[in-house]
Each structure stands twice: as C-alpha cells, then as structure tokens.
Regions:
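Ubiquitin-like/PB1-type beta-grasp interaction modules and other compact soluble beta-rich domains
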Residues: 1-66
Length: 67
C-alpha cells in the first residue's frame, strides 16, 4: 500500500499501524513528535491503535530547539 509521509510516497505491506510506521521511519525513540493523518492530529497514545490505509497522508512534525 502507498502511504504519503510529508508529501513523499512510501510503499509498505498492509496491515500497518501508525506506531509501526514511526518505527520503520526510525523515529520511535525521538521526543517532540506530532503526527497528523489526513489532516487530523493523532494523540500519541492512539498511535498503536490507528490502522493506516492505502493513500493515507501522514504529516510528521518534529520540534527543534534553537535560539
């Protein structure tokens, strides 16, 4: 199935949860991450329950520090 992550196409085998996607992208241990699926923010405690579907659009935002 095709999942769009930050406007880039990625191909995955189904089924795939949001937490599976985060792990495959190497972001599982990072903090300060917010994720929206199809323009709806998903609370972190729901990442393991949300099944992704073909053509879903995932936006991952990572907080950064600076000055």
């Amino acid at each position: 199935m095709t999942i769009w992550v930050n406007q880039k196409e990625h191909l995955y085998d189904a089924p795939l949860t949001l937490v599976d996607l985060v792990k495959q992208l190497g972001k599982a241990k990072k903090t300060g991450i917010a994720i929206a699926v199809n323009n709806s923010v998903v609370p972190k405690n729901n990442w393991g329950n949300l099944m992704l579907n073909d053509q879903d659009k995932v936006t991952i935002i990572t907080a950064t520090q600076g000055g």
